[in-house]
Amino acid sequence: MSEFAIRNMDQVAPVSNMYRGMLKRQPAFDTFDSSNSLFAGYFLSLNEDQTLQEVPTGFDSTSYESNNCELPLLTPCSKAVMSQALKDTFSGFTKEQCRLGIPNNPWLWTEQHVCQWLAWATNEFSLANVNIHQFLMSGQDLCNLGKERFLELAPDYVGDILWEHLEQMIKDSQEKTQDQYVESSHLTSVPHWVNNNSLTVNVDQTPYGIQMPGYPKALSYPKPNLLSDICQTSTGPNLLSPEQDFSLFPKTQVDAVSVNYCTVNQDFTRSNLNLLIDNSGKLREHESSESGAESYESSDSMLQSWNSQSSLVDLQRVPSYESFEDDCSQSLCMSKPTMSFKDYIQDRSDPVEQGKPVIPAAILAGFTGSGPIQLWQFLLELLTDKSCQSFISWTGDGWEFKLADPDEVARRWGRRKNKPKMNYEKLSRGLRYYYDKNIIHKTSGKRYVYRFVCDLQNLLGYTAEELHAMLGVQPDTED
């Protein structure tokens, strides 16, 4: 065997100094008795030369035990494994949902469903210090909290797990709903485009390449099906003529965002879609603007505004305070609903609890189909809550109300919408926007005094006097 061959054999599997004490050379050299060999002197000198040429790396002092760590360092692969393990654990909640009848979509949960979910998670993950009383809210309110507010209510190191599970359930429910929607319709005409709850459009790919900016995809979860009893899908003929090419987006792109128009047992005509379709039969582009920390919040909601001072009998669109520059000058003509909010509450067997608002904003939002809670709904909730009369209350003169502490009202509105920077200046901007829509007017000559000028009596099913009596409101004698 030549010297060249021996050198190459010695270099077959070079090993770093870190593992040199742990690994042996090839067995052929271990069993070879070199004491009487012709190459004995060569191997000795080779090892000595190699030892002299080795440069210390700092790893030689590492103990053998340190290399036998049971838990390897996290890598992208191991993180994916851990994430999959969490998902597998979350899947155990499916059996609990079937057993207790908990809806798959967290937006549809009641307070009892939320408590049942927390009880399961507490037991499944052996969680401690979970105060369920802090989460006594509906699924819609829970989802509207936002991650930051949710983590504040949850114990340390626990909130992330619960929030991830909540997001996973919302995502799975949304994907399942979209799959069912795609299977049931090829989305080739407007009647297929009309959902039982809302009109939906795609934000990834819309007809003719029209994009719809301003809709935050992270918040485009399906809203609760609170209108299932009073809303039906139109089954009339196709609304567009054959020459108007209105083939909608392909089946693979169905990332829906609710446009929030309540379809209340209506007969659609071509004029009903003037907000959504222009003269060429194409979707109109919805535009919005963002300034500073303010962002477009879902889409405009609707308030039933049969104004006694005007001949309007349609439904007014009531925006949130962030969407002042959105084009809301037109309204979608629809017939009046078949029941009032009062009847709706009674049909749902939700009696007004002692110490609770007579008109909860979350339920009112579901009744009107507005999606996220709007400012006017929030004000009605505060005005029908006896505990809030120290900073906002009815004056006793019809639908007139006064902000005794406008900063406190703004603070509570910011807390509800998870906007810590909310102040009265921004709140009043939203109120001013309602002026032109004949929803709320400022009372002249009185500071912080406003009045609902829309027909709340038909919407709510209560007269102003009935609400005043329920809340113990006395007429305001101040000038």
UniProtKB/Swiss-Prot annotation:
Family, as annotated: Belongs to the ETS family.
Summary of the function given for this chain in its UniProt record: Probable transcription factor.
Protein name (Swiss-Prot/TrEMBL): Protein C-ets-2
Location(s) in or outside the cell: Nucleus
Cross-referenced PROSITE patterns: ETS_DOMAIN_1 (PS00345), ETS_DOMAIN_2 (PS00346), ETS_DOMAIN_3 (PS50061), PNT (PS51433)
Assigned keywords, A-Z: DNA-binding, Nucleus, Proto-oncogene, Transcription, Transcription regulation
Cross-referenced CDD domains: SAM_PNT-ETS-2 (cd08543)
Molecular function GO terms recorded: DNA-binding transcription factor activity, RNA polymerase II-specific; DNA-binding transcription repressor activity, RNA polymerase II-specific; protein domain specific binding; RNA polymerase II cis-regulatory region sequence-specific DNA binding; RNA polymerase II-specific DNA-binding transcription factor binding
Keyword Cell inner membrane carried by entry: no
UniProt DNA-binding region: 373-453
GO CC terms, sorted: cytosol; nucleoplasm; nucleus; plasma membrane
GO biological process: branching involved in blood vessel morphogenesis; cell differentiation; coronary artery morphogenesis; ectodermal cell fate commitment; mesoderm development; positive regulation of transcription by RNA polymerase II; primitive streak formation; regulation of transcription by RNA polymerase II
Pfam families according to UniProt: Ets, Ets1_N_flank, SAM_PNT
Positions of the PNT domain: 88-173
Gene: ETS2
